[in-house]
Regions:
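Mid-domain alpha/beta scaffold segments of enzyme catalytic cores
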Residues: 2-289
Length: 289
């Protein structure tokens, strides 16, 4: 990772206390990709990181499990624009439900939490649902105790997840790729959750409705790449970081705005999400003047 006299992002990512209070930096316009699986790029990782740095795409790199997070930590050392975060995806929950003390160690060192959540739709094995719920509550309780934001997968578990956020007073939550009921969407909005709009906004009228419903101050963008486009289009397309530009343009069209306005709005919202975050001091220096 490039080192700089004014910013030591790696120290913050490792949970170390590093800050230079009252030191202003020039605010730089950035795209925000608030949910990505960078460890899945394989041989295309160098190209992906090149796009992230060249196009100034701040990237929240979400983990699926412990090996995923360890790989993301290494990737995060290569770019100050990558935030590695630890989580256990609901598909992996059954593998980790009896290993909570081990997970606690990684939660402690991760500056934010994700990907976590419930998947009671695409995961057909209902015997895994109790493990999903136990893992999720463990992470949300820890996020509340440690004051960390969470990045949530909510498919068919939207109301349960909202109830846990309320129970543990976790106010800084990113709801990733929301596609659930509109009434629960409104409840989550009322609670103050942020929502990422991703590549499906280019193809789905329902997602367009969601993109148009989320209030300005809670809007974020994502790609969920490299696999989201492949999953949506049922082809072999590998989604690269630059796809976030198409997402921004599509969101702008839906909201009758401009790409520049949406980019600025999303950056401001992400800055608000991390404002006063004790774990992300250096990131605030990077992102705001």
């Amino acid at each position: 990772m490039p080192q700089d006299d004014s910013i030591n992002w790696l120290a913050s990512a490792r949970g170390e206390n590093y800050d230079r209070p009252n030191e202003a930096v020039t605010k730089i316009a950035m795209l925000i990709d608030a949910h990505v699986h960078l460890d899945k790029y394989g041989d295309l990782l160098d190209q992906a990181l090149g796009e992230i740095d060249a196009q100034r795409i701040f990237t929240v790199a979400t983990a699926m499990d412990v090996p995923s997070y360890l790989e993301l930590q290494k990737i995060g050392e290569r770019s100050e624009l990558v935030l590695p975060t630890f989580g256990i995806h609901p598909r992996r929950a059954a593998e980790y439900v009896d290993r909570l003390p081990e997970l606690g160690r990684y939660i402690d060192i991760s500056p934010a939490i994700g990907e976590i959540g419930l998947d009671l739709h695409w995961v057909k094995d209902t015997t895994t649902y109790p493990a999903q719920r136990k893992i999720l509550e463990y992470f949300i309780a820890a996020a509340g105790e440690q004051n960390k934001f969470v990045n949530l997968h909510t498919k068919a578990g939207e109301k349960e997840i909202l109830d846990l956020l309320v129970k543990y007073n976790v106010r800084r939550a990113i709801i990733h790729w929301y596609s659930g009921p509109m009434d629960i969407l409104q409840e989550m909005i009322d609670f103050g959750c942020y929502f990422t709009i991703g590549v499906e906004v280019m193809y789905s009228d329902y997602i367009k409705d969601i993109a148009n419903t989320v209030p300005d101050h809670l809007l974020l963008t994502e790609t969920d790449n490299p696999g989201a486009l492949k999953w949506l289009k049922k082809n072999d397309e590998i989604g690269m970081p630059s796809a976030i530009e198409r997402v921004v343009e599509a969101v702008a069209a839906v909201r009758r705005s401009t790409a520049n306005q949406i980019e600025a709005l999303v950056q401001a919202n992400f800055c608000q999400l991390i404002s006063n975050d004790p774990h992300l001091k250096a990131l605030r220096t990077l992102m705001s003047s």
